[in-house]
Amino acid sequence: MEKTVIVTGGCGYIGSHIARAFKQNGDRVFVIDRVKREHTLKDVDGYFISDFASEESLATVLNLSPDVIVHCAGTSLVGPSITDPADYYTNNVSKTIKLLDLVKDFEKKPIILFSSSASVYGNGTNKPFNEGDPINPISPYGKTKAMVESILTDYWNAYAIPSTVFRYFNAAGAEPFNFDLGQEPNATHIVARALEASITA
């Protein structure tokens, strides 16, 4: 059955891959992102170049009444989160609450697929990490992801908004069929840098 899917941050590395996967599944896919990258938008049913918490974006969510919201938008680097935590708490937590506060009043609640991070584990002693390990984020970035995970649990208990959390660890690589979606140039992620070094060595 065809679903209506909104991907926030759908022009980004992870969001663009997810948007394409839903489209290949036969779903209607709409992207909301502050940055327009043409090559990531060629197959989607619609896109809106705007902050995901703007009035325009929230009106779009309301009008589309999606079955699924894949929430990838936010600020994502650990280092800058230490020097400018306000930006991270605003973009990753406060704005997500605005989105959830809209959705909680929907008669038909969409499932929220949240793009979290393995950084919620901090410097845990059990490696590799598994989902049952305690979380102990050490950066503001990781803390914002852990906070949203907790908020999603509370919103499920209070408002029956279903959600699933994905804790990624250093996603890297290109889309395997067309090779038109892939890692950003000058990536800061260690896996991407290691791959680049091995290819150019």
Model regions: which residues?
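N-terminal Rossmann NAD(P)H-binding glycine-rich loop of SDR-like oxidoreductase domains
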Residues: 5-24
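NAD(P)H-binding glycine-rich loop region in Rossmannoid oxidoreductase-like domains
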Residues: 55-91, 126
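Conserved Rossmann-fold NAD(P)-dependent oxidoreductase catalytic core, especially the SDR/UDP-sugar
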Residues: 71, 97-140, 154-158, 164
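Rossmann-fold cofactor-recognition segment
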Residues: 44-54
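NAD(P)-dependent short-chain dehydrogenase/reductase
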Residues: 153-201
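Conserved glycine-rich Rossmann-like NAD(P)H-binding loop of the short-chain dehydrogenase/reductase
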Residues: 27-35
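Active-site helix of classical SDR
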Residues: 144
